[in-house]
Amino acid sequence: MTLLVRNEADIVEANIEYHLAQGVDFVIATDHGSNDGTSEILREYERMGVAKVIRDDGEGHRQSDRVTRMVEIARLGQHADWVINNDADEFWWPLVGNLRDVFASIPPCFGQIEVKRRNFRPRAGGSDGPFYSRLIYREASSSNLVGHALEPKVAHRPCPGVVVAPGNHSLQGTELLAVPAGEVLEVLHFPMRSHEQFERKVVQTGEGYEQMHDRSPMVGRDQMALLELYRAGKLRQYYDGLAVDEGALERGLQMSTLVVDRRLDDFMRTLHSGERPRVRPDAPFARALLRRTMDALSEVERNREEIAALRAENEGLSASLDEATRKLESTTRELQSASQALHLLRTSRLVRSTTWARRLYYRASGRR
């Protein structure tokens, strides 16, 4: 798993603990200039032999470059079967078994999987205690922090040439076949854990994008919008509007826009008690959903084989077309040669006819 972090001391330890318990073998983390204790937490996992830490104090929020670099380390140094491209506030949740089980069940023909995210809302009031015990109200349908459709996250089999796009939402430079959206994985997302944490994140990320003078306007547009709210003095109002108090909770539950979700809290409490956590499915039919998803994957694989057969047939037709084109070009050249010869012949006959007519005229007129 890759992690790009900056000042995430309130969550990064829980993130690494959780994913290691779920079957992740190794963590490659880039610490982008942290000064809040994040570096010390990461170094402890490095000393334990389950992580590699890269310190990067470079300017700009060049997420794609830094994550792609970690992916190459995972491919060449760790010989990883799969790489989860993760952020500190994201927890990959398997609906059945653990993460190792889910990734091991994906047929070899698929090289990447896109996973939906589910946002958890902040609590109104205090911020005492672990975030996973406080943030238990999940949106039934999530959008990002400025109201746009929440983009999925991507995990993939490492291969040469892969570039992880900004935000870890997609891949570039590869034709890895993607697993269709299934119901075996989701990402639990905790972007707003306190107002202080949220404000710090908005400022450091937004200013990081400002330092990227070659940045496309579409890259980081949501973070830049939040930075503008901060500079206009409206970020606190925005945060409070999303925080869940008793009234908002009651309305959200009645309208089915909010769900009480204690899965991560239960998992982490069990983990800290020394017991082996057991993943609780999101619904009693999770195993049936897994079978249904795997059936869909098999159907896609069959379709892929049919497409390959059609491509082979198309290549045969293309070869026939190429041969016919060559014959047509050859015939065209022959026609052009014949046309030129005919033109020369006609010109020659015209010259001979003109000469013969002149001689007759001279004889008739007595001229030579």
Please place each PLM-identified region on the residue numbering.
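Active-site beta-to-alpha loop of glycosyltransferases that engages the nucleotide-sugar donor
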Residues: L3-E17, G33
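Short alpha-helix within the catalytic core of nucleotide-sugar-dependent glycosyltransferases
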Residues: E13-E17, S39-R43, W93-P107
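Short beta-strand-to-loop acidic/aromatic patch adjacent to the donor-nucleotide binding site
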Residues: H79-W93
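Short beta-strand/loop segment that forms part of the nucleotide-sugar
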Residues: D25-G33, I54-D57
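Boundary detector for helix-to-coil junctions that initiate low-complexity/charged tails
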Residues: H272-R368
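Catalytic-site signature of metal-activated, phosphate-bearing donor transferases
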Residues: D65-V67, P94-A288
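Active-site-proximal specificity loops/subdomain of glycosyltransferases
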Residues: S39-V83
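Short, acidic, metal-binding catalytic loop of nucleotide-sugar glycosyltransferases
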Residues: E17-D25
